[in-house]
C-alpha cells in the first residue's frame, strides 16, 4: 500500500500531483537566477568600465602629471560606467576625475573644455550627494568646483559646511578647507563664523604638523583670522608666528 503524501487532500496535492516538486523548485530557482543576472548585469558592466579608469585615478590622487589621452580614455570609460549603472558612487567617481582634470594646469586643453568638465563635475556631485550625503570629501570637492566656476559665494560656503559636518576630523581635508574658508569668509553668517573658528582651533590642537596653517596665509586678513581662531593661547600664537616667518623664507 502506497503511503499518502502529507500534503494530499489539502488542495496543493491535487493541483500539482502530476508535477514533480523538484522540477517546480528548479524552475522557480531558474527564474530567480535569470532575474538576478538581469538585475546584476548593469552593476557588473559598470564596475568593469570603471576599472578602466583606475590607473588615471591613482595618478590623480597621488598628484602625478596627467596625460590627456589617458584622461580622455578614462572619462569615456566612466561615462560608460555611469550609463550602465547610474548610481551615486559612479557619478562621484567621475566627478573626481572631471574636476581633477579641469584643474590640472599641465593638460593642454582650452578654458572652454575646463569649464565644461567642471560643470559636468558639479552636476555629478550634486546628484551623488543628494543620494549619498555622508561624504565629506565629495562635499569639499563640490565647494572647490563651485569656487572654480563661479568665484567665492554663499554656495561655496554651503558645500564647505556640509564637508565639515560630515567629516570634521579628516585631517587631510583641512588644508584645502582652510583655504576655502579664508577665501569665502565674508559669506559666512555670524553663527557659522563661530562654528568655523571652533573647528579651526580644534584642528590646530589636534595637528602634529601645523605648517599648512601658515602656508594658507596670503593676506593680512588671513593672518588676523588665524590669530583670532587660536585665541589667547600664548604658545599657539608664538608657534604661529614662527611658522609664518619660516613660510616667508621659502
Where do the PLM segments sit?
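N-terminal Lys/Arg-rich, disordered targeting/topogenic segments
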Residues: 1-16
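Polar low-complexity intrinsically disordered regions
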Residues: 3-5, 65, 246-250
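Non-cytosolic head/periplasmic domains of membrane-anchored proteins
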Residues: 109-182, 188
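Alpha-helical repeat scaffolds
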Residues: 33-39, 71-81, 113-127, 154-164, ...
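Hydrophobic membrane-insertion alpha-helices, especially the h-region
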Residues: 22-43
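Terminal alpha-helical segments
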Residues: 41, 61-77, 172
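Amphipathic alpha-helical repeat scaffolds of TPR domains
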Residues: 44-62, 83-108, 132-145, 171-183, ...
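Terminal, low-structured helical/coil segments at or just beyond the last alpha-helical repeat
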Residues: 184-250
Amino acid at each position: 500500500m502506497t503511503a499518502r503524501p502529507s500534503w494530499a487532500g489539502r488542495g496543493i496535492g491535487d493541483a500539482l500531483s502530476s508535477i514533480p516538486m523538484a522540477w517546480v523548485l528548479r524552475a522557480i530557482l531558474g527564474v530567480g537566477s535569470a532575474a538576478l543576472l538581469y538585475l546584476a548585469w548593469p552593476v557588473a558592466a559598470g564596475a568593469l568600465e570603471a576599472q578602466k579608469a583606475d590607473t588615471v585615478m591613482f595618478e590623480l590622487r597621488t598628484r602625478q602629471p596627467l596625460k590627456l589621452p589617458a584622461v580622455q580614455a578614462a572619462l569615456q570609460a566612466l561615462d560608460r560606467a555611469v550609463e550602465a549603472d547610474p548610481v551615486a558612487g559612479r557619478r562621484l567617481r567621475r566627478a573626481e576625475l572631471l574636476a581633477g582634470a579641469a584643474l590640472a594646469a599641465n593638460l593642454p586643453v582650452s578654458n572652454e573644455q575646463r569649464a565644461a568638465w567642471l560643470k559636468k563635475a558639479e552636476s555629478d556631485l550634486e546628484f551623488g550627494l543628494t543620494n549619498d550625503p555622508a561624504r565629506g570629501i565629495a562635499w569639499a570637492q563640490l565647494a572647490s568646483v563651485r569656487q572654480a566656476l563661479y568665484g567665492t559665494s554663499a554656495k561655496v560656503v554651503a558645500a564647505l559646511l556640509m564637508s565639515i559636518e560630515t567629516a570634521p576630523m579628516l585631517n587631510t581635508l583641512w588644508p584645502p578647507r582652510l583655504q576655502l574658508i579664508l577665501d569665502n569668509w565674508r559669506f559666512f553668517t555670524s553663527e557659522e563664523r563661530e562654528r568655523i573658528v571652533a573647528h579651526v582651533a580644534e584642528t590646530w590642537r589636534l595637528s602634529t604638523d601645523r605648517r599648512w596653517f601658515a602656508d594658507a596665509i596670503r593676506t593680512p586678513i588671513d593672518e588676523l583670522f588665524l590669530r583670532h581662531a587660536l585665541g589667547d593661547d600664548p604658545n599657539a600664537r608664538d608657534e604661529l608666528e614662527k611658522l609664518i616667518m619660516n613660510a616667508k623664507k621659502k
